[in-house]
Amino acid sequence: MLVSAKEMLDKAKAGHYAVGQFNINNLEWTKAILLTAQECNSPVILGVSEGAGKYMTGYKTVVGMVNGMLEELNSTVPVALHLDHGSYEGCMKCIEAGFSSIMFDGSHYPIEENVAKTKELVAICAEKGMSLEAEVGSIGGEEDGVVGRGECADPNECKAIADLGVDMLAAGIGNIHGKYPENWEGLSFETLDAIQQLTGDMPLVLHGGTGIPEDMIKKAIDLGVAKINVNTECQLAFAAATREYVEAGKDLQGKGFDPRKLLAPGFEAIKETVKVKMELFGSVNKA
């Protein structure tokens, strides 16, 4: 059964570990992440971008697939299904479809409008028992066509949004989506610390978890990050394993063209990536 992400993240913040949000793109992705969470006895958040939701034909399809898998796999660990970087309209659709958590990305609105829309969603989510993530300061890189350049959020704006009653807060601290450029300056721990001081027990979210050095990840968790988003790394692992299979000519041997065989190496690569991340984040055996 899907759960709100609130309880798992409050526990993570108090226990100085982080829960991974791993984005799903199809059945293989979802199955790989759910199986790994069960094997690691770890809570997990399945992230769905608006683009991925559209690709999977819509949010109701996603909810049906995830709920069906949870039942068929006899999953016992806490699992949240979360809209990633949702527009206001996307949030409304996911609330209706049966998601257990949403992120409203109002970072491109003026702060007053971000506050007004967030307030409205806080009330709806509280009524439905869903968790809500808000964002302040755009995260760098490109996410479904929205480009941000890795800026640092204003800690006072973070406090203003946190005080509205959201369950978790994503704040830009120099992080970006996708591969990090060679001249990346690293995370701003000064900004993170200032945000943490003003937002107290609020679980903080680190987007763009791919490619951030392990020591920075651990320090971010120490400073209050309780949710870390990973997407690109799983995609790269899946692509590399699939390419290796095809380049070795395995799709031409026997029934190697069978999609279940063709996609198996990529599936295993996602599992391994997720396992390594759960170990790094400290969420193993925290279910």
Predicted regions and their residues:
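Poly-acidic low-complexity segments
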Residues: S4, N23, D154, S188, ...
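Active-site proximal loops enriched in glycine and acidic residues that flank catalytic Cys/His/Asp
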Residues: I173, G208-T210, T232
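C-terminal alpha-helical cap/extension of soluble enzyme domains
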Residues: P213-A287
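Alpha/beta enzyme core
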Residues: V3-K11, G15, L27-A52, T57-T76, ...
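A short N-terminal beta->alpha junction/helix N-cap motif
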Residues: Y17-N25, E50-K54, K261, P265
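Short catalytic-loop micro-motif centered on adjacent basic/acidic residues
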Residues: V19-N23, L81-H82, M103, L204-H207, ...
